[in-house]
């Protein structure tokens, strides 16, 4: 029942983001209509359409991006979503290996999908953007999880059992591009 409660609490604030021929996930961060996602979800530019679970589709604009951390903030018209409660954030300093986690997102475009797992490790490094000189930035403090993360989950929230965001699902490391690998 704890999983059902978290899903019902958080899922209305989790979105599917369409950008050109690509898609990913994100979550409503505040009442001003700001949505957190991954930079690689919106980096190709073009028109951004945000799909909410209740069927609302809203255009979005990019507010800011950080390719080095692979994070981006987009914004929709807040007056159109005033009935949706934004997510809450947890204190990431309190995370423990073995803690149960929940991922909600749109793997393969399947909006509002939930998977569960545990925190497999903390403080991993993960390569991110390539700079103009060819060097790559390592994203620090990455949470490794065994919750199934697939293409399309990028930008969605990783949650604790209180429904608080503890991380942003970013990538999967797998030789077969599926959930048989390690999620971050």
Protein language model annotation of sequence segments:
Residues 1-184:
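Serine-dependent protease modules
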């Amino acid at each position: 029942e704890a999983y059902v409660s978290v899903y019902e609490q958080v899922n209305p604030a989790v979105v599917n983001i369409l950008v050109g021929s690509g898609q990913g996930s994100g979550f409503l961060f505040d009442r001003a209509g700001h949505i957190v996602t991954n930079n690689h979800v919106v980096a190709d530019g073009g028109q951004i359409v945000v799909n909410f679970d209740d069927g609302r589709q809203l255009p979005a604009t990019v507010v800011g991006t950080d390719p080095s951390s692979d994070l981006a903030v987009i914004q929709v018209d807040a007056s159109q979503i005033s009935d949706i409660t934004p997510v809450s954030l947890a204190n990431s300093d309190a995370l423990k290996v073995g803690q149960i986690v929940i991922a909600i997102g749109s793997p393969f475009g399947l909006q509002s999908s939930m998977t569960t797992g545990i925190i497999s490790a903390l403080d991993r490094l993960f390569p991110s953007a390539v700079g103009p000189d060819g060097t790559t930035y390592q994203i620090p403090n990455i949470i490794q999880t065994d919750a199934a993360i697939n293409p399309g989950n990028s930008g969605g929230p990783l949650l604790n059992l209180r429904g608080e965001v503890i991380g942003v699902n970013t990538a999967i490391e797998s030789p077969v591009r599926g959930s048989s690998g390690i999620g971050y």
